[in-house]
Amino acid sequence: MPQLNSGGGDELGANDELIRFKDEGEQEEKSPGEGSAEGDLADVKSSLVNESENHSSDSDSEVERRPPPRETFEKPRDYLSEAFRRQQDAAFFKGPPYAGYPFLMIPDLGGHYLPNGALSPSARAYLQMKWPLLDSPSTAGLKDARSPSPAHLSNKVPVVQHPHHMHPLTPLITYSNEHFSPGTPPGHLSPEIDPKTGIPRPPHPSELSPYYPLSPGAVGQIPHPLGWLVPQQGQPMYSIPPGGFRHPYPALAMNASMSSLVSSRFSPHMVPPPHHSLHTSGIPHPAIVSPIVKQEPSSGNISPNLSTKSNVVVKKEEEKKPHIKKPLNAFMLYMKEMRAKVVAECTLKESAAINQILGRRWHSLSREEQAKYYELARKERQLHSQLYPSWSARDNYGKKKKRKREKQSPEMENYTKTKKMCVQHFPSDKSCDSPASSHGSMLDSPATPSAALASPAAPAATHSEQAQPLSLTTKPEARALSHSAAFLASKSPSSSSLSGHLPSPVGSPLLSRPIPLTSSILSPPGVFPSALQALPLLQAQPLSLVTRSSD
């Protein structure tokens, strides 16, 4: 039996036998593969002949596969005919007839396909009709160290090709129709780096025996690696280069349960971005679910940007529109006509003064003279309505208000700043308020600290302090500090006499520092009567706003 010298007895393909269907030769002749399809056939058939000698040994499962030599793609058809006879004599499949079928491992392929013998003819006939994936091997076969290598399919999982019994829209998982580059090993046998994608391909362990081939002819959009196939064992998976396989046959059919498995078990993070084209039919099957999650921006993220852009566009459009003035009324027409005369007669240059003069003259006019300007104003409105039919006075009013607010905002800020500065830089002798003023401010803002209880002694120091106007703009803190400073600085007999009336343990804390209103209410009963005694003194003095001393 002819054999190939394929690198020291190493195998190139699967170590199992194949059953050749009658329609394979016809399909191969009809396929547009030209010479590369024949090269694939020669490669696999020669490997089948070569592996028949080493079929009894299990040690070849650990043998490292090397790239196929170039000559294997150019062998004559004699080896093909011999391989066909070899396949027809066999009882079961030894492997896929084409190297273009990548092997994908499915860990839980059911139990009744695992006996150590060939399938019955009835089961084989059933396999020709449907893809028997879902009844597949238990994980016990995966744990066996003596189980065949990934290149050995002997009596484990049936590999069925049925090119004539399938719908063109039922592809499962395929790769682009490109041939292996010379010297590049198959993706499922090599631990090297994929020359097309640059992604390292780690070798999968030898104990993962059950796997099944998938057609490479239909779906190029599901890339590798397929880490979802062995989630239970947590073992590393091999990857299949998307440009590494070529097959003339269309895709194999897949039932609904397998499609749900593919759609649910793909892990998006294991798959690189696709760089491929769709099937020749252009319509992917619903079972093919792209593993890459499409990231579409949410409407919440887009709406603020769109709203801001729309606002900017609207503002720009408003700015581009010319400012349409409202039609002049009778008085405005009179002012427009008489302003030049008034300016020539008067030496005043202020616009306000000129407007006042024009207003007086307008009211001094008779009804007949004013009626002339009213008629002019009516004509002006008619002409304006013809020129600008969609114009409304509200447009100008809104714009003017916005402009005024924008212009006034910095001025108001400067005004408030200067006002605060003036309040803070008052001299200490002038910033002291009258006792009534401090008491009134305390009533206005009871929660703020004030020197209302300390004011009975301090304000009575001088007569000029009582004549100060009521100041409501000064801060309570500044007022309290001024009261305490004035009390310490004053040495008049009236202040000493007032302080003498108060008890010594109570008067000193009250007069030494400002006390908030809440603290005076929550103070002990010994302090509260003294505060009540001080209040009549506050109320007895008159409330003077602009009074001056009579001296």
UniProtKB/Swiss-Prot annotation:
The gene is tcf7l1-b. Residues 465-474 have a biased composition (Polar residues). Interacts with csnk1e, ctnnb1-A, ctbp-B, dact1-A and gsk3b. May interact with ase and tle4-A. Interacts with tle1-B. This is Transcription factor 7-like 1-B. Residues 1-11 have a biased composition (Gly residues). Signal peptide: none annotated. GO terms for cellular component: beta-catenin-TCF complex; chromatin. Residues 17-32, 52-77, 407-416 have a biased composition (Basic and acidic residues). It holds the Pfam family CTNNB1_binding. Phosphorylated. Phosphorylation by csnk1e promotes binding to ctnnb1-A while phosphorylation by gsk3b may reverse this effect. Residues 1-77, 183-213, 391-474, 492-515 are annotated as: Disordered. Its main location: nucleus.
